[in-house]
Amino acid sequence: MKNKIIALLVLFTVILFSSAQAQTTAHKFEAGKNTFLLDGKPFVVKAAELHYTRIPQAYWSHRIEMCKALGMNTICIYIFWNIHEQEEGKFDFSGQNDIAAFCKLAQQHGMYVIVRPGPYVCAEWEMGGLPWWLLKKKDVALRTLDPYYMERVGIFMKEVGKQLAPLQVNKGGNIIMVQVENEYGSYGTDKPLSLIHI
């Protein structure tokens, strides 16, 4: 009986360490000539759109499992700036807003993540995710090279980077791509220079 218990403990330890190692193994993700490549092999991104801010945190795991059950291998998420910086200079990445926890949870379920941090995301969200307080600055020109706007975008992106940089696929995480901005140029008045700067 004692030998069986020891054998089970050894087996459990091996499984625990091998699964932990598998979750933190660095990978190489790149665009090939005609397809995406993961560790040099063709990889088809089968993605589901899942907005962590629209799902109570208690249901995150269930929703990720549902996406996986549908045959998806990737979750796409928007990062709504106006949720994370409701007051200028005060950032919240905790609880319901914990994007790193959401990405790690997706990784535990064997899913990759495509992050779309905006700054503008649209997604039928108030001001496309831009915080209301940007409009307190007289004559601010959103989604342009306006100095105040670009300064605030830079600060926000750095805060997002602090949360997510360690979760990139090449660092053992599951973030395979980042899409900056959304629907840029759709209205014919957007200036391409601000997109290049971001």
Q: Where are the regions a protein language model picked out?
A:
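Conserved, mostly hydrophobic/aromatic
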Residues: 40, 75, 106, 160, ...
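An active-site-proximal structural segment forming one wall of the substrate-binding cleft
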Residues: 99-115, 138-175
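The substrate-binding groove and active-site-proximal loops of carbohydrate-active enzymes
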Residues: 46-56, 81-97, 136-154, 181-191
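Bacterial N-terminal signal peptides
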Residues: 7-16
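N-terminal carbohydrate-binding accessory modules
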Residues: 22-74, 104
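Hydrophobic faces of well-ordered beta-strands that scaffold small-molecule active sites
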Residues: 46-48, 75-77, 113-115, 176, ...
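Conserved small/polar residues in nucleotide/adenosyl-binding loops
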Residues: 196-198
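Aromatic-lined substrate-binding rim segments of carbohydrate-active enzymes
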Residues: 60-126
